[in-house]
Structures are given as C-alpha cells and as structure tokens.
Amino acid sequence: MATGPRYTVPMRRRREARTNYHQRLRLLKSGKPRLVARKSNNQTKAQLVVTGPQGDETVASATSADLEAFGWEAPTGNLPAAYLTGLLAGKRAIEAGLDEAVLDIGLNTATPGNKVFAVQEGVIDAGLEVPHNEDVFADWQRTRGAHIAEYAEQLEDGLYSGDFDATELPDHFDEVRERVEDEL
C-alpha cells in the first residue's frame, strides 16, 4: 500500500527561481569573494560578497543608477552601463581591500556578450583578479555602445527622441569612464 508521494519538493528559493544551490555550493567552495552580477531591463547590479559563518556580507556594490553621480545621462539598462557599473564596483572593492573574486551569474544564461560579462570585464579593468575567458566578452566597440549609436543614426528624426542623443553614446561612455577611474 502506498504511504505518500514519491517526489520531493524543491527548496523554496529554487522554486521561486532565485537560487541555484548546486552552483552556489561550487562558488562557496572556491573560498573567494563572489562577484554577484544581476541584470534587468532597466538596470544592472554588481556586488562583491564575502561568505562567513553568520551569512553573506556585501563588501562593495554598485548599481547602474549610481552612474548618474558621474554624469551618465544615457539609459541604465544597456551594455555600456553594465560595463561602467562593473568598473565602479571594482574600484569600490579595491578600496575595501579585495583583490580577487569569482563571478556569480545566478540563474542568468551564460551567453557570450551578455551584460553580466560586461560587468565582469569592468571589474577586471578596475584591477580585480577574476577568472575569465576572453571569448565571452563583447567586442570593445559594442561595449562602448557603437551598435546603439549606429541604430540611432538609421532611424528617422523623432523616432529616437528623448533627453539623450544616442548617436553620441560612445563619446559619452569614454567621458564617464574617465570620471569613474579618476574619482575613485
């Protein structure tokens, strides 16, 4: 006679599609701080997290909304903003005393040229040691936003109107990148 169900219910955070526990365990066994990169349509977040007996502790963090303090006027959900967010988080992590990390992309798909890899590239350019494969990074012109500027030039006037002229994105990216590197 049957005594109960033959299945096991996944852990709550796995059911909610928030945590991959197998991946988390592998990252924790490395003993290095984790570079937690998360993306959405509107912004990118980067955190450097150290795991201890009392739980995870965020040592340094940055969001793409923080870029406004450095003069960023373009939208914050694109690839150039993700790179600059990683650069800012990396600079803050170095100030906090970290020198290495391992990338934690969570449940994001590891697609080459993805925003999470742009965050990783920014952190590496800031001076942190992060194990990586150069093949997953986007082309530098794409990271600067040249593809967005080319698309904006193809459109008719008025279709891409807003507060920021997207045709000037690569130059604006270079200006903000210099400010982030100089001020921290």
From Swiss-Prot:
Keywords (alphabetical) are: Ribonucleoprotein, Ribosomal protein, RNA-binding, rRNA-binding
Q: Which GO terms describe its molecular function?
A: 5S rRNA binding; structural constituent of ribosome
* Pfam families in the cross-refs: Ribosomal_L5e
Q: Which GO terms describe its biological process?
A: ribosomal large subunit assembly; translation
Q: Cross-referenced SUPFAM superfamilies, in alphabetical order?
A: Translational machinery components
What does the UniProt record say this protein does? Answer: This is one of the proteins that bind and probably mediate the attachment of the 5S RNA into the large ribosomal subunit, where it forms part of the central protuberance.
Q: Which family does it belong to?
A: Belongs to the universal ribosomal protein uL18 family.
Protein name according to UniProt: Large ribosomal subunit protein uL18
What is the organism of origin for this protein? Natronomonas pharaonis (strain ATCC 35678 / DSM 2160 / CIP 103997 / JCM 8858 / NBRC 14720 / NCIMB 2260 / Gabara) (Halobacterium pharaonis)
Gene name of this polypeptide: rpl18
